[in-house]
Amino acid sequence: MMKTNYENIAMLLQNGTSVKIYADNFSVSNIRLLAQTAVKHGAVLHLVVNPDYILADNLKLISQDGRKNIFVEFV
């Protein structure tokens, strides 16, 4: 199994591929950049989030980047 990293996800999004990631593996700033990349290239970024890990305010900022392109799932 390939280790998930920011560069791999960004490359997939730049190619218009929709991806589902576990937000715990990324910094908030990287998630924000991935969200912006998804919007720019018409891909969908599905974030699986542990509510104890990331603040709701950060999720609001991230989701403002593109409501149709960003999905947040709490686990």
For each feature predicted by the language model, list its residue ranges:
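General marker for long, soluble alpha-helical cores
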Residues: M1-V75
